[in-house]
Design a protein with these regions (language model features):
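Alpha-solenoid helical repeat scaffolds
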Residues: 1-272
Length: 272
């Protein structure tokens, strides 16, 4: 019998049939028709593409055919972030690292760009070892565009911590504390105070580190990273070991699967 190639449901069913049979070449013949058909919902195209690109073995075996599909999708839907990011990752997978960077850069000011898209670009810039000036300029663009986005604000603070510009990192996290206070979000406030404690430790300012951790636990007594770090750094001083053990036990009980928290608890017991 003849297949009705004008029926989207039929095309999808036939593609899925060949997939189950292991005939990937025939499956892609029908997938290509689906992806090119303007009647097919964009969400369905996003879902089907992600299925194939997430399967790395399949992706490697069909790199060029999937690449052709992705290129077609970026032409048909030039502002769709799923397809934009898929093409960028496709270029990276093919070794075209600078071309991928230029492509991501061209699309970062699109109206459809999200805070996560900026973070992806920033991480890629760090991977490519772009200059500090370029990265910092992009960080500023991101936080200006998405003012009040805590993920971006934290990322910016972590970046300055990583490059040991602790003063700038502290300033950013203090902004976060003020923002959390205004929002009356105690968990967020605790989170930023914990980050500040980590920086003070890196700076060798022990008392300010402990004060920040203490304040963080006032706003969220179950802040696991703070409980763990406070316990560990306090134990290094040889003081307050009972308090350190209590915090280490609590951190471990709140996340039993994390080996770091188990190690901290064992370390504090050893110090006692």
């Amino acid at each position: 019998y003849q297949i009705d190639t004008t029926n989207l449901t039929t095309l999808a069913e036939v593609a899925d049939y060949y997939n189950r049979q292991g005939n990937r070449s025939k499956m892609l013949d029908f997938e290509e028709r689906l992806f090119k058909d303007s009647r097919a919902p964009v969400k369905d195209k996003e879902y089907r593409l992600q299925q194939y690109t997430n399967n790395m073995e399949f992706y490697r075996e069909n790199y060029f055919r999937l690449g052709s599909i992705i290129v077609g999708l970026t032409i048909d839907y030039p502002t769709n972030r799923t397809f934009i990011n898929a093409y960028a990752m496709h270029l990276i997978g093919g070794g075209a690292t600078e071309e991928a960077y230029d492509y991501m850069l061209r699309h970062i000011d699109d109206a459809s760009a999200t805070a996560d898209d900026y973070i992806m670009l920033l991480q890629y810039m760090m991977f490519l070892e772009k200059s500090d000036e370029e990265i910092q300029a992009m960080l500023d663009r991101a936080t200006e565009r998405f003012e009040g986005n805590d993920t971006l604000l934290s990322f910016k603070g972590f970046y300055y911590t990583e490059v040991e510009e602790y003063g700038k990192a502290l300033k950013i996290f203090k902004q976060g504390v003020k923002r959390a206070k205004k929002l009356k979000d105690n968990k967020l406030r605790s989170q930023y105070l914990g980050y500040m404690g980590d920086i003070y430790h890196e700076m060798g300012k022990e008392q300010m580190c402990f004060r920040a951790y203490y304040d963080a636990l006032l706003y969220d007594e179950n802040n696991i990273p703070v409980l763990n770090n406070y316990a560990y750094y306090l134990s290094l001083t040889g003081r307050g070991l009972d308090k350190a053990l209590t915090m280490a036990h609590l951190a471990m009980s709140l996340d039993k699967s994390n080996a770091t928290y188990i190690d901290t608890c064992a370390w504090v017991l050893y110090k006692m």
